[in-house]
Amino acid sequence: MEIAKAVGEWSKDPSTKIGAVAVGSKGQILAQGYNGFARGILDTEERYNDRPTKYKYIVHAEQNLIYNATYNGVSLDGSTLYVTGLPVCSECAKGVIQVGIRRVYMPKDFDIKGWSESWELSASMFKEADVYYEFI
């Protein structure tokens, strides 16, 4: 989890710094991601400070991790995901399930305000797809 926190610090988002790390069966880091803009997109302070604009450009840490693994030809099947800041949203949960991540660890000290509906759907999908999750 500490490595995921460090990766989150790479985000240029002044208000939210989320990090994600996928770990293989031998403890090796397979991929990492943080909330930020896509490759080649200017991540200017103005875009981050205008929330409606930011939300159009931002890639969640979990999505970024999946894209980075794909870009580098790394399979995440059977891996473990560590994510900081917030629980996995329902959009990211679909990607987590689809690439074969089997375990998800999230921080227990987060503010669920505004995220409860999305998290409830994520939890439901994780249970149905037999993805283990835990707040640590």
Feature map (PLM): residue ranges:
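Zinc-dependent deaminase catalytic domain
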Residues: M1-I136
